[in-house]
Amino acid sequence: MILTVDVGNTRIKAAVFEGSSVLEYFVFEKNELEKRIEKILEKFPNCSDLVVASVGDVEKQSFLSFEKQLNVHFFTHEDIFPFHNKYATPKTLGIDRMILAAGATLQFPKQNRLVIDAGTCITYDFIDENDNYLGGAISPGLRLRYETLHNYTARLPLLTLDQPHSYIGDSTAQAIHSGVVNGFVYEIDGFIDEYRSNFSNFIIILTGGDAEFLAKRLKNTIFANSNFLLESLSQTYQYKIDND
């Protein structure tokens, strides 16, 4: 069994895998890390490996405390990945983005793939049908857009995510919701349209904390999976074992 962990900017997601099957997903706060990992291991005592995407120094020490029980692996740029990294600055490419690209390469072979991760930031990562990682884009996520409007203006309120009533906002709150949510959706659809106009045999994978909210609002056909990173971690780790 493998325990995969995704340390996000706000929360931690985890999953236990046996082979290619997921047994259970978990979500918890960063300050609960060690306690919750201990609980997971009590429930799944046959876990042999702990695999982590990207992590800060504080969290890393917490994970290392489990080294006596598990094989602990932090993915780095030195690991083997199932794609050719054509990024102009490969060492600056986030490990989480590399894991997503690896998962897309392994799950959807011989296709052009665009992975969209809608979290604190939204990232776009493109892997062509020849398994070349070419790059993508980064822009603010939904929450960051709400916070930016509040923090960098004198009077605009800080709102939480909500579906706008219309694209024409008839109040300040509705105008903000329309600008943030509709603008976000138009951005994603615009990127997808641009890729579609240049590449055929194409699949779009949408993941991240806001994936479910966005999936039903996009005009393009997508494969939505909010746990794609955790699944990709398990698959990429198995790929590493098989190819080391």
UniProtKB/Swiss-Prot annotation:
Keywords attached to this entry: ATP-binding, Coenzyme A biosynthesis, Cytoplasm, Kinase, Metal-binding, Nucleotide-binding, Potassium, Transferase
Keyword Metal-binding listed: yes
E.C. number(s) listed in UniProt: 2.7.1.33
GO terms for MF: ATP binding; metal ion binding; pantothenate kinase activity
Binding site for substrate: Y87, G94, I95, D96, R97, T172
One record GO biological process: coenzyme A biosynthetic process
TM annotation in the entry: none
Protein name: Type III pantothenate kinase
Native source organism of the sequence: Flavobacterium johnsoniae (strain ATCC 17061 / DSM 2064 / JCM 8514 / BCRC 14874 / CCUG 350202 / NBRC 14942 / NCIMB 11054 / UW101) (Cytophaga johnsonae)
